[in-house]
């Protein structure tokens, strides 16, 4: 009965019934699922989805559920619209519904069009039904539901599932163009989900937050909803918040949300652990048991248990060769078999008597073999009971002990014993044997063939000394008065006054002809300063100034002795005092002259302007010019010019230059405005160039290699000669370059001197040598003279017109030579020894310390360690 009533309904009401049945079915399914979840306790990870399932989908769209609901609503609305159109209804949208002004008109239209059969009460009667009727009614509803599903969804099948597999909850539909569309179920956030505790995140991307300053919102969340700007409190609220800081307050503002940025308890705990250097991850155990990967026990692995190579099982060719050699030696008899060795041993035991030297013969020495020289036989003084004349007295023993071991005639003292058994062991036997072994090892023997040459023919033909006069031959005057060693002396340009400096700290000036002392200045007080003494002094080459430069310790004193006339003394003092004004007001112009400038002076004018700018930084001689706009800093760094006090002015001192280290040598430029000083212990400031007219002192070198021993100016060229311990360098002051490097080939140079013509140089060394360098030839010496027995202290050319030079040594002897330099460059200089002058005493192995030639005469002045100065004349 129920089936007939359902089938008898009008076709126009079928869609409406289907929609109603679909809604009822959906509500029933939802209610059933809710009850099932309560009963069975469905886990939070399961999803309850109604829709189509596409197992092949991989997408993960979070808005799939919302899209599904919207699609179902659109389908329902479309069904309702189609149903209304079938009934003749004209309403299609929300705007059309506004045309009905009242409910009466709407009800009237519905009453006219609706069929009473649509609202039939069949199946909903309150009367009791039989069991068969109830079953028929249920079958009718089931058929209606099936029909509704077929009509509403067509080919799409609806499945209601409650499963845990997310891939089976996907909905598979199509877009308007027919392409497949996959809708995944919405994720239900639970406690373990990543998004369960996440706040609304601003998804504006790379758009700056400043773009939302004039808008009430600050961006959009993941669902496209606006994130409203948080309300800002008043100034009072902000003050209260700053006073009562909430938990996790940082004072920072989140740019994405506009809300204050807070730190959680977990983040605070993490920060605390980092500050306390604790373990930040509780799951990590810092004290895990040690796993010793590398042990002493060898592990059997492919690296050590490799298969044996084939070559170990193949006979070796090299072993075969060695075996063949052994076989050959056995056949030749060089190797005996055990049987033959036993037989030979038995024969030897039978022959007991044999000649030890039977098969030996004298082997002649090799032709190049040189036997060691035999020791000299002992003399009478080496006897244990020598004659009385060989024994030394107390005075001779004391003299023998004071001598240097190298200078002793014998290395033992003869002693007398009554019997041979009383002679003790010789304590120097091991040392003498060791020294002899060193001599044989370090001094190889050489076989020399004797030449049958007349020795007289080897001596060059030299002119007679009588033909080379004048030269000094005798001591005419002795200048006595100093109590210490006279280390230096100098003669004034006119040749009238001799200045000497001694270890007693005094400078004395003597009259040359009479030997009378005319002036004395005590520059060093030996009671307060016993280490300093007069090291060097030299007169200014300008005879009109009368200036004497004295080096005492670290100071350089410029004196004008009151022995000249008023005019000369006044000129010298004014020359020194003019520099004080320059030092006060500074330099206002460049010292370097511009190339191409019209200069009226000779080459020396440029030299004087450019000497103080010479700089050499390496052996290649590439110098760098120092700036001269302001030379005061350089002067203050290397030396300091000091105005003397009243007591020093009374001694004739006009200026004092204070250096860093002890000044050993001083040399004037021929113009008299510049002078160079040498301080060997001052390293890079060992060489200083001082300018008298400007009171300037500067170091021309940034660094120096080796210890500087002496420095001289060229007689007329803008060149500077600097001598270190082993080499001599020549610098061009105009071009700021290194011109030449001389290699004397000695260990320790003492001093140098230049020939007045400037093309030859003399050098003296502490290893008893005098070297003559020709600057036009090679860097090695032209002549090396070895005639002194001890260190050569000084060597000097005659600065006048006489071809003389002399050398002084610690042996107390002065050698005078004739040295002629020819104008022809193809002719070698002529060197002739003239005279040996001896008169100074040797004190503590120190003899003559300094010599100087008279500027005009062939006179020689010398200073010795005996405290005297001597004049040697013709």
Curated annotation (Swiss-Prot):
Residues 1-148, 593-640 are annotated as: Disordered. InterPro entries: BOP1/Erb1, BOP1_N_dom, WD40/YVTN_repeat-like_dom_sf, WD40_repeat_CS, WD40_repeat_dom_sf, WD40_rpt. It is found in: Nucleus, Nucleolus; Nucleus, Nucleoplasm. Residues 55-77, 95-104, 128-139, 603-620 have a biased composition (Acidic residues). Component of the NOP7 complex, which is required for maturation of the 25S and 5.8S ribosomal RNAs and formation of the 60S ribosome. Belongs to the WD repeat BOP1/ERB1 family. The lineage of its organism: Eukaryota, Fungi, Dikarya, Ascomycota, Saccharomycotina. It comes from the Eukaryota. Component of the NOP7 complex, composed of ERB1, NOP7 and YTM1. The complex is held together by ERB1, which interacts with NOP7 via its N-terminal domain and with YTM1 via a high-affinity interaction between the seven-bladed beta-propeller domains of the 2 proteins. The NOP7 complex associates with the 66S pre-ribosome. This is Ribosome biogenesis protein ERB1. Keywords: Nucleus, Repeat, Ribosome biogenesis, rRNA processing, WD repeat. GO terms for cellular component: nucleoplasm; PeBoW complex; preribosome, large subunit precursor. Residues 312-429 are annotated as: Required for interaction with NOP7. GO terms for biological process: maturation of 5.8S rRNA from tricistronic rRNA transcript (SSU-rRNA, 5.8S rRNA, LSU-rRNA); maturation of LSU-rRNA from tricistronic rRNA transcript (SSU-rRNA, 5.8S rRNA, LSU-rRNA). WD repeats lie at residues 481-520, 529-569, 658-700, 703-741, 744-783, 787-827, 843-874. Residues 27-41, 78-89, 593-602 have a biased composition (Basic and acidic residues). The keyword Repeat applies.
